[in-house]
Amino acid sequence: MTTIASGHGIATVAAGKTLDVWFPAPQLGALAATVPSELTALVGSDEARGVTRELVKVEIDITAAPTDAQDAYLRLHLLSHRLVKPHGLSLEGIFGLLNNVVWTNFGPCAVEGFESTRARLKAAYGHVTVLSVDKFPRMVDYVIPSGVRIADADRVRLGAHLA
């Protein structure tokens, strides 16, 4: 069994803190040399949310404890993509590596200064819906596993392994 996993992703960053990372195609094994072109198109800033979207390349040892938020998000994606079974990788200390995030209909936002962010979002787009304030996002905003039905997406977090 391989203990290496990897992925190219897009990290949402605010004031140097990683709010989330989306890995559309995580894999077991070494990092692929080619970055998917659809990811490079997502790099940039979102002034209304006060964030930047950055391309990240992550390769981890799944038997070691996660080292940062990017590593943690890759592990959550591996579970939800069903590439690794529950207890098949180390999640030791993961809670402390993730930031609290305001999850909105426009994407993740920093908790600090959110009322100013809300005002910018309202000015740009109108109504803003806050879905939750939590460390773990809804799974379906990142992964749609095949062969399952999810009646209430708000109750299933990234990192869930649905059979």
What is each PLM-predicted segment?
Residues 143-163:
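Structural signal for interior beta-strand "rungs" in well-ordered beta-sheet cores
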Residues 1-140:
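Terminal amphipathic alpha-helical/low-complexity segments used for targeting or macromolecular assembly
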